[in-house]
Structures are given as structure tokens and as C-alpha cells.
Amino acid sequence: MAKLTVKDVDLKGKKVLVRVDFNVPLKDGVITNDNRITAALPTIKYIIEQGGRAILFSHLGRVKEEADKEGKSLAPVAADLAAKLGQDVVFPGVTRGSKLEEAINALEDGQVLLVENTRFEDVDGKKESKNDEELGKYWASLGDGIFVNDAFGTAHRAHASNVGISANVEKAVAGFLLENEIAYIQEAVETPERPFVAILGGSKVSDKIGVIENLLEKADKVLIGGGMTYTFYKAQGIEIGNSLVEEDKLDVAKDLLEKSNGKLILPVDSKEANAFAGYTEVRDTEGEAVSEGFLGLDIGPKSIAKFDEALTGAKTVVWNGPMGVFENPDFQAGTIGVMDAIVKQPGVKSIIGGGDSAAAAINLGRADKFSWISTGGGASMELLEGKVLPGLAALTEK
């Protein structure tokens, strides 16, 4: 990576500003999935082991008005992080002001402080999300000229807590997580060991147009599953029953199929039900067509076999988006089948591009079998699309 990393700077005795991604799910104030906190530990531990004073910034959820702050404090995260680090984490509970400044100035080498949810600054004019210049300068002033960005999950956004701070420090560098994310995903797409197979699922073609176009150029095969299958079907005149379809994207789907040179591989059957919820009948279709009054909610057994065959011998696989409504046991066979087909390939470099795919791998017990599971859904999608990420572009060149 042509950007400076946390290993390229002297941290001893320095107040080091760190953007992490602690946007974790909370239920009644309890963290239900701590993966993002765990993923940030190597960078935080390295900073404090080097004698730095780590000042952490993160958002949590969306905050637009005062009422939205309810249940969005990072206090539970501070407690969880303290337990994981085995040391106190200072949590002043504010995003600016004398209370924060005094707590930072009182830090000693090897200590950690967590600033309150950066999006609390969005209540008064979206200062965080709109990369307010004054806020970026203020947060940058709290440190000693070093900023570490380790939040891949927000690298596709230009916010005050990443791009804003970067613009106002002497050195803006990548943390270990950001470095790994970029290395795995960018290398997989730009310099893959071949055969390179991409698998794209999810419900909407509109979300993946740019990704499909980019991967059709880079990959040897692009397998399509999930709800967007039926937009591709309808574009070819195949009956789809009551399945999800984006009527305004039929021409786009047709165009992608025509210019794919056979690289785009669609399912050949579906698991259909007579309703999305409260269904009384679930069955496999004979072929591509979905029955009248039914909707496709997963790829079928013939498609699983076809995708298994398409993945045989693959050396690089990038997967983004489940094959069906995997949260429901009746419609998770396709996602499980594809996961198992990926991980059984000898010597394969297998990458999950965040979001629902990551949740599927974790929930269905396959996470440890993949080479890399991205922590950022939107950011990984934009990398797969070949876009430049603002949070990465803002870092200091080597």
C-alpha cells in the first residue's frame, strides 16, 4: 500500500488520534455482536505498547436530532473495550469541550480514551457527516499531529472524524485493519490468482450495477444469486411469479447480460414459496420460471450444483450478498451451499465483502473457513466497484 501505516511513525509519548469503527449492534444497551471492537484491537494494542496515548473516535448508528441520541452512547463500548484490553478506558462522555480536553491532557503513556459518538455532532447541522471544517480542525488539535485511520467501514465517507482530521495533522496513517482490508480486497480484484470467481447476491440490481460492471472486466466468472436474479430473469422474458423485481432496471440487466460474454452465470432454479411471510407451501421450481402466485426466496438445488461446478478450481473468490433469505432456515440452503463450495477449494483465497454475507457466514458457522471477512459493507462494495475511497485517499503518501 502506497500510504503510511501506523508502523511508519514514532508513537511514544504522543497523543494519537484513532478513527475506529465501533458501530456495533446494541439491544437494551447490550452489544449483540462485538466483531468490530475485536477487529480494532491489534491497532489499539500496538499504539499503547509503543507508549502512545490512544484517543479513539467512532460513530454509532444514525443521529439526526436530539431524541436520536437515546441508546446511542458509546458507554457500553467503552466498558467492553476495557474488558478486552484488560485496562481502564477513559470515557468523558462528550465530543468536545473542557471536560474532554482535560481528560485527554491527563492521559499517560499507554492509556486509552474513547470520545463520545461522533455523530452526536450531527444534531446541530450535520457537522460530522458533512465534514465540517471547524470540527475537523478541533478534533485534530486534540492530538500531537498523528492520526490513525482504522475504520474501513467508513472509509467510503468523507466525514470530519476521518477526512477532516486527516487534513489537519502532520501525518495521517493506516491502521492494521484498514491496511489488511485494502490489501485483501484490492489485490483480489486488481491482481488475483486465477481462476477468479465473483459471487454477487442480495436483493437489488441497482445496488450492484457498478460492481457487476467492474467485476465483469476483472473476474473469470460472475455468479448471480439472491433477489436480483429475478430482474435478470424478467429481462429475458422468464416468468417470475410474484418475485422481487426492479422494473426500471430491466434494460440495465439485459445490457449486462449481453455484454458479459458468457461470464455472468445465473441460477437455473429457485426455492419458491406462496408468500414471503406466513407461507403454507415451499418447493423447488422445475427450471428458471417461478410459478404464478409464488415468489423465489432462494436458489434451488440445481443452481447450488451449478455454482459448485463453476467454483471448482477457483483460486480467488470474492463473495458479496447472500443467495436467499438466509435468516429463515427454509431459505438458507443456497447460501450454505455456496459457502461450502467456496471453502472446499484447495488453496483458495476467499473474501467476504461485509454486510449480510458476513452475517451469514458468522450465523451459519462458516466464518473461520474464509481467508478474510470485511468489516465494511458499503466501503468494500465501492472498492469492488473500483472507486477511490475518500478516507484512504486522505492518508499521507509513503
From Swiss-Prot:
Recorded superkingdom: Bacteria
The molecular function GO annotations come to:
ADP binding; ATP binding; phosphoglycerate kinase activity
User: Has the keyword Aminoacyl-tRNA synthetase been applied to this entry?
Assistant: no
Question: At which positions is substrate bound?
Answer: D21, F22, N23, R36, H59, L60, G61, R62, R119, R157
Q: By its UniProt entry, which Pfam families does this protein fall under?
A: PGK
State where the protein is found. Cytoplasm
Q: Which GO terms describe its cellular component?
A: cytosol
Under PROSITE patterns, the record lists: PGLYCERATE_KINASE (PS00111)
Question: Mind listing the UniProt keywords for this protein, alphabetically?
Answer: ATP-binding, Cytoplasm, Glycolysis, Kinase, Nucleotide-binding, Transferase
A single GO BP term for this record reads: glycolytic process
Which ranges form a coiled coil? none
According to UniProt, this protein's pathway is: Carbohydrate degradation; glycolysis; pyruvate from D-glyceraldehyde 3-phosphate: step 2/5
Predominant localisation class: cytoplasm
Instruction: State which Enzyme Commission number(s) the record gives.
Output: 2.7.2.3
Q: Which SUPFAM superfamilies match?
A: Phosphoglycerate kinase
Residues recorded as binding ATP, renumbered to this chain, are: K208, G296, E327, G354, G355, D356, S357
Q: Does the keyword Transferase apply?
A: yes
Q: Which reaction does it catalyse?
A: (2R)-3-phosphoglycerate + ATP = (2R)-3-phospho-glyceroyl phosphate + ADP
Subunit: Monomer.
Extract the HAMAP family matched here.
Answer: Phosphoglyc_kinase (MF_00145)
Which family does this protein fall into? Belongs to the phosphoglycerate kinase family.
The protein here is known as Phosphoglycerate kinase
